[in-house]
């Protein structure tokens, strides 16, 4: 049996649907249940439901054999994990956005940036040769430039609807993201038969 860490929310739902279609799960966990561990009757997969930012930590520390996490989260955290498979679900992009009329150029002061992704944001501005001040926020990132907290934001974008609704414009795409299957190296070796079968099955989408 493989223990799989999944992020709560839409990505978990997409991942579970995929595993059901591939015969690794027999049914969806009860949506009304408060339990965070789901043992599927087929006995192939045990699911841990965790915060999206915590999936990689559970896998890296061997509390789970594998996990499904966004590429944005994995790149931001710099985890030591095997990332053998892009599942092609949960697609979005990490972008720089700012109010209409804002241009990205060298200024007399640091560019103020609000984001949940300080490492990726800092790396982007470094490669642009621009100095920045990062404000790490945990939600409602689009609000920051509207109230003067920041000049711009670095955040995930799916359709761009939220940006448009708040008068923001996408300036640069920093990273294309999608859901990745990740393994800790111990499980990838110790459970290599199950891991190989799981990866092979999910790769045939």
From Swiss-Prot:
Subcellular location, principal: cytoplasm
Enzyme class: transferase
GO CC term (a single one): cytoplasm
InterPro entries: ATP_PRibTrfase_cat (IPR013820), ATP_PRibTrfase_CS (IPR018198), ATP_PRibTrfase_HisG (IPR001348), ATP_PRibTrfase_HisG_short (IPR024893)
UniProt keyword annotation of Protein transport present: no
Pathway(s) served: Amino-acid biosynthesis; L-histidine biosynthesis; L-histidine from 5-phospho-alpha-D-ribose 1-diphosphate: step 1/9
GO MF terms, alphabetically ordered: ATP binding; ATP phosphoribosyltransferase activity
Domain of life: Bacteria
Claim: Glycosyltransferase is one of the keywords in the record: yes
Pfam family, one: HisG
Keywords: Amino-acid biosynthesis, ATP-binding, Cytoplasm, Glycosyltransferase, Histidine biosynthesis, Nucleotide-binding, Transferase
Reaction catalysis annotation: 1-(5-phospho-beta-D-ribosyl)-ATP + diphosphate = 5-phospho-alpha-D-ribose 1-diphosphate + ATP
UniProt subcellular location: Cytoplasm
EC number(s) recorded for this UniProt protein: 2.4.2.17
Oligomeric form and interacting partners: Heteromultimer composed of HisG and HisZ subunits.
Domain comment as written in the entry: Lacks the C-terminal regulatory region which is replaced by HisZ.
Entry's family note: Belongs to the ATP phosphoribosyltransferase family. Short subfamily.
Role: Catalyzes the condensation of ATP and 5-phosphoribose 1-diphosphate to form N'-(5'-phosphoribosyl)-ATP (PR-ATP). Has a crucial role in the pathway because the rate of histidine biosynthesis seems to be controlled primarily by regulation of HisG enzymatic activity.
Protein name according to UniProt: ATP phosphoribosyltransferase
Species: Leptospira borgpetersenii serovar Hardjo-bovis (strain JB197)
Gene this chain is encoded by: hisG
